[in-house]
UniProtKB/Swiss-Prot annotation:
SUPFAM superfamilies: EF-G C-terminal domain-like, P-loop containing nucleoside triphosphate hydrolases, Ribosomal protein S5 domain 2-like, Translation proteins. Keywords: Cytoplasm, Elongation factor, GTP-binding, Nucleotide-binding, Protein biosynthesis. Catalyzes the GTP-dependent ribosomal translocation step during translation elongation. During this step, the ribosome changes from the pre-translocational (PRE) to the post-translocational (POST) state as the newly formed A-site-bound peptidyl-tRNA and P-site-bound deacylated tRNA move to the P and E sites, respectively. Catalyzes the coordinated movement of the two tRNA molecules, the mRNA and conformational changes in the ribosome. This is Elongation factor G. InterPro entries: EF-G-like_DII, EFG_II, EFG_III, EFG_III/V, EFG_IV, EFG_V, EFG_V-like, G_TR_CS. GTP binds at residues 17-24, 85-89, 139-142. The lineage of its organism: Bacteria, Pseudomonadati, Aquificota, Aquificia, Aquificales. It comes from Aquifex aeolicus (strain VF5).
Length: 699
């Protein structure tokens, strides 16, 4: 099957925003105007096309990345836009990061009322890290308190990359009629009766001409600063054509020197078509970007793949989902080469050959079967046994693309199936969830036998429990959310472990002496082999390390994992006949426990970065409450009538905070929180936690 459009007419874009900035609504309008849907889906009616999980329809938030292909004609040429819709809620930021890897460009949506919000700043930093070009859309211009110029200034001050306005609004709040195009110097008014499908291009009203002229000058100055030739023309007072400006702005956007800024109101159907034009005009096609780099797993050499159908096949699995009818769906972005339905691919990450069954072009939750997928394209594959982050390629030309690092879960909860018959089904479902979501884990407590699920926040786990019930019919009882505490040490200590077992026949002998010392917070674990003169044979050194690591899974204070420790193995002894791998594992484990007792062990807890937005009059109450939760206020910022309070608060104190905040602010306060770092638990609180944990273990 030939391509629908040539690769240079392809745009792979993400739509990224803070929760409630109107991202899904904007996506819905794009699908409507590109002819993909015949009725506009409203989020608050629970009918949005891209939000297709029942939990999303109920909560009005986007949880999974849905991807869809649509087409747009610009200057008589047909383009394909693959849209990856991403969630704005902090518990799901893993979805955003995972999709960044496969995007060529991003539309960042900001609310004209709330401006640049914390989650948008975090996502912008991720876009910087993945070097993704972007354009900005200031949405909700029809809302009370909308202010394009204030938000533009916030983008300029808070985010990297210089913004350049290519439109300004025609009116604001309930007077918002349309936009002024600063390139063409025309006003665009949308016709309400056509649901915004039709608009008229008219002369700029006299009262806006001066402002438009001022902002056009700013736009030209900003663009020519990125292009020496145009700068020369500009300084000589020569006329610069619209074509030249667009070309220079495209180049500067792709090189991440500028971010074009547009505005509108997706809900009121205003501003979406020019946004689509800007996606075509300024965001890159796969061939406008540098080739992808990876490593050859056989040789360790660097490999490069250019976005061409003639190169060896290479694709990245960026999302895995289970579908009740098709089984596992693996979403892939093809970076080079082509893949035919039914052919074999090499999963370089797992080092195995796999068969790609059917290939599906996805439109939110409906699908179209295709026979071949080519370089630059995105599709879902049925029948692959891949996990998120796997590289799929041609076996003769193996390559592994950089694997993403995901944060460890910070919260856990005990669950048990309500009926015995669901026990086995539950473990299959949990395995599926772990494949789909790298920040979700399921484990069994070795002492109590309880099943524990671990995730990035309360909402994350709630939704997983909800999915068990809705998608698989498994009802579970849930325990109270638990904090993922850890343990560490404060000082150096030496520990000795000796394991001698003499029973009839061959005995066991292992003997290790180690020194442990604290590492900086977040540094993890280091093991140093400092054995001289063969007092422990080389083959048993890894056994000691394995034993140490095993002991670190169960700290001596309360059985929590031990982190941020350097272990130096420097002495010990062995027996010619009785020494074995298992004996040295036990010796390593005993040595660590011995040393840890003397090393001033302490309990660590996850500290969350909390940002609360509240009307000014409730600030005192909100701060008082955060202080009572052992919070440290890190700073405050005024945004008109709203105050943003930034604080570091222990996760243990944040359960049920949403309800408290609602009552403190009469429902007007909002907050987001994300993991920041681990810190020591104050002694009297640590004693209480250790006491409760030990009581729980003995009961």
């Amino acid at each position: 099957m030939a391509r629908e459009v040539p690769i240079e007419k392809l745009r792979n874009i993400g739509i990224v925003a803070h929760i409630d900035a109107g991202k899904t609504t904007t996506t819905e309008r794009i699908l409507y105007y590109t002819g993909k849907t015949y009725k506009i889906g409203e989020v608050h009616e629970g009918a949005a096309t891209m939000d297709w999980m029942p939990q999303e329809k109920e909560r009005g938030i986007t949880i999974t990345v849905a991807t869809t292909a649509c087409y747009w004609t610009r200057n008589g040429e047909r383009y394909q836009i693959n849209i990856i819709d991403t969630p704005g809620h902090v518990d799901f930021s893993v979805e955003v990061v995972r999709s960044m890897k496969v995007l060529d460009g991003i539309v960042f949506i900001f609310s004209a009322v709330e401006g640049v919000q914390p989650q948008s700043e975090a996502n912008w930093r991720w876009a910087d890290r993945f070097q993704v070009p972007r354009i900005a859309f200031i949405n909700k211009m029809d809302r009370l308190g909308a202010d394009f110029y204030r938000v533009f200034k916030e983008i300029e001050e808070k985010l990297t990359i210089k913004p350049v306005a290519i439109q300004i609004p025609l009116g604001a709040e309930d007077q918002f009629e349309g936009v002024i195009d600063l390139m063409e110097m025309k006003a665009i008014r949308w016709l309400e009766e056509t649901l915004g499908a039709k608009y008229e291009v008219v002369d700029i009203p006299p009262e806006y001409q001066e402002k438009a002229q001022e902002w056009r000058e700013k736009m030209i100055e900003t663009i020519v600063e990125t292009d020496d030739e145009l700068m020369e023309k500009y300084l000589e007072g020569q006329e610069i054509s619209i074509d030249e400006l667009r070309k220079a702005l495209r180049k500067a956007t792709i090189e991440r020197k500028l971010v074009p800024v547009l505005c509108g109101s997706a809900f009121k159907n205003k501003g979406v078509q020019p946004l689509l034009d800007a996606v075509i005009d300024y965001l890159p096609s796969p061939i406008d970007l540098p080739p992808v780099k990876g490593t050859n797993p056989k040789t360790g050499e660097e490999e490069v793949r250019h976005p061409s159908d003639d190169e060896p096949f290479c694709a990245y699995a960026f999302k895995v989902m289970s579908d009740p009818y098709a089984g596992q769906l693996t979403y892939i972005r093809v970076f080079s080469g082509t893949l035919k339905a039914g052919s074999y691919v090499y999963n370089a990450t797992k080092d195995e050959k796999q068969r790609a069954g059917r290939l599906l072009l996805m439109h939110a939750n409906s699908r179209e079967e295709i026979q071949q997928v080519s370089a630059g394209e995105i599709c879902a594959v049925v029948g692959l046994d891949a996990a998120t982050g796997d590289t799929l390629c041609d076996e003769k030309h193996p390559i592994i693309l950089e694997k993403l690092e995901f944060p460890d879960p910070v919260i856990s909860m005990a669950i048990e199936p309500k009926t015995k018959k669901d026990q086995e089904k539950l473990s299959q479902v949990l395995n599926k969830f772990m494949k789909e979501d790298p920040t979700f884990r399921a484990t069994t407590d070795p002492e109590t036998g309880q099943i524990l699920i671990h995730g990035m926040g309360e909402l994350h786990l709630e939704i997983m429990v909800d999915r068990m019930k809705r998608e698989y019919g498994i009802e579970v009882n849930v325990g109270k959310p638990q904090v993922a505490y850890k343990e560490t040490i404060r000082k150096k200590a030496i520990g000795e472990g000796k394991f001698i077992k003499q029973t009839g026949g061959r005995g066991q002998y292992g003997h290790a002496i180690i020194e442990i010392e604290p590492l900086p917070r977040g540094a993890g674990f280091e093991f140093i082999d400092d054995i001289h003169g063969g007092v422990i044979p080389k083959e048993f050194i890894p056994s000691v390390e394995k034993g140490v690591k095993e002991a670190m899974q169960n700290g001596i204070l309360a059985g929590y994992p031990v982190v941020d420790v350097r272990v130096r193995l420097f002495d010990g002894s062995y027996h010619e006949v009785d020494s074995s791998d298992i004996a040295f594992q036990v010796a390593g484990s005993l040595a660590f426990k011995d040393a840890a007792k003397k090393a001033d062990p302490v309990l660590l807890e996850p500290i969350m970065e909390v940002e609360v937005e509240t009307p000014e009059k409730y600030v005192g109450d909100v701060i008082g409450d955060l202080n009572s939760r052992r919070g440290k206020i890190m700073g405050m910022e005024n945004k008109g009538v709203i105050t943003v309070i930034k604080a570091h608060v222990p996760l243990a104190e944040m359960f049920g905070y949403a309800t408290t905040l609602r009552s403190l602010t009469q429902g007007r306060g909002t907050f987001i929180m994300k993991f920041s770092h681990y810190d020591e638990v104050p002694q009297q609180i640590a004693e209480k936690i250790i006491g409760e944990r030990m009581a729980g273990k003995s009961s």
